[in-house]
From Swiss-Prot:
Part of an ATP-dependent transport system LolCDE responsible for the release of lipoproteins targeted to the outer membrane from the inner membrane. Such a release is dependent of the sorting-signal (absence of an Asp at position 2 of the mature lipoprotein) and of LolA. One of its GO terms (biological process) is lipoprotein localization to outer membrane. Its main location: membrane. The chain crosses the membrane at residues 21-41, 276-296, 334-354, 379-399. One of its GO terms (cellular component) is plasma membrane protein complex. Belongs to the ABC-4 integral membrane protein family. LolC/E subfamily. It comes from the Bacteria. It is a multi-pass membrane protein. It is found in: Cell inner membrane. Keywords: Cell inner membrane, Cell membrane, Membrane, Transmembrane, Transmembrane helix, Transport. It comes from Haemophilus influenzae (strain ATCC 51907 / DSM 11121 / KW20 / Rd). This is Lipoprotein-releasing system transmembrane protein LolE. Pfam families: FtsX, MacB_PCD.
Amino acid sequence: MNTPFFISWRYQRGKQKNPLVALIAKFSAIGIALGVAVLIVGLSAMNGFERELNQRILAVVPHAEILSAPNATEPTIHHWQNLEKRLQQNPQIKGISPFVSFTALVENGSKLKVVQVKGVEKQAEDKVSSIGNFVQEQGWNKFEKEGGLVLGSGIAKELDVKVGDWITLLISQQNGDEQFAQPTREPVQVTSILRLDGQLDYSYALLPLAQAQTFLTYQPDQITGVELKLDDPFSARNLDLSMLNDYPQMLYMQNWISKFGYMYRDIQLIRTVMYIAMVLVIGVACFNIVSTLIMAVKDKQGDIAIMRTLGANNAFIKRIFIWYGLQAGMKGCLIGIVLGIILALNLTTFIQGIEWVIGKKLLSGDVYFVDFLPSELHWLDVLMVLVAALALSLMASLYPASRAAKLQPAQVLSSH
């Protein structure tokens, strides 16, 4: 066994002359453990939010939409099949789905709620999103055949609506002078509930494309726009649409980044801030090791003097106390990693338990894109936290170890 390591290990396990050394060592280990555990849990939560953003937002919302330009004389797109043929020339585009979109007031008795209604074709929509996976009770399979409204679960809860209930859509209409006329009232049956466990549940509803066109008195080839699925969602801003340069209608594109990109930026920003904050916390805890080692050096200076008289050089003495500091840091790291892993793997359940006890949601679904705290443990994060904590422990050990190596054995032994 490495002799300096063995001696430092015996010092760790042996009884200290000064009990304050052991007390400070315990507090430094606790501080490191808490910092490591919190950092692992925090990073796992950020990973969980990123996963849910991919699965519940990017899998549901279109990566890009082609719409009629706001200043165009015609607010809708006619003969959309011609537009589809042109877009298919771009290999970046993996799916195209026509849609009709409008804002309506949902009425159920005396309760009202403003919703964004989108009319889609099931088969085409399946090519651009996974929204069918979030429609409950096999409602997506019956969507096109039976018609009716797929309503967000948050809207259904607020309006006290269940599957099979009839509600009324109040749809505003424009006359030829582009002035709003008396809204039309369209009764429609709720055939299924859409549950994404987040913000979209409180603002989103789906209709079959043909039914939506009928409500708006559109022609069969008349739509609001087309949804696009791209091979790389992050290339949406640089999508090549040169094939539409000579299209007979003014069009424009909007992408998911303009709507939801802030969520990705916020997650990355919080992750960075969390790294900095927790490294500082671990750093403060690690520098308790400085105090521990300085006191340990003073406690063991007689042993150091004896080893120096027996031939131990400066490097030998320095390695003893570097190992001493690393072992103190490793103890806190291991405790923190075990605690952090257990909490990260059970974070969602743990938070749900707290919500059950206090009787309140910590994350409101109508504010955040998910209404629960997700978690996903990445072992690379655990390794990075371990390396960072050990590196800080090593840095904290260097100064006290150097002081131990500079002790003069003659002075120490003469004072004993």
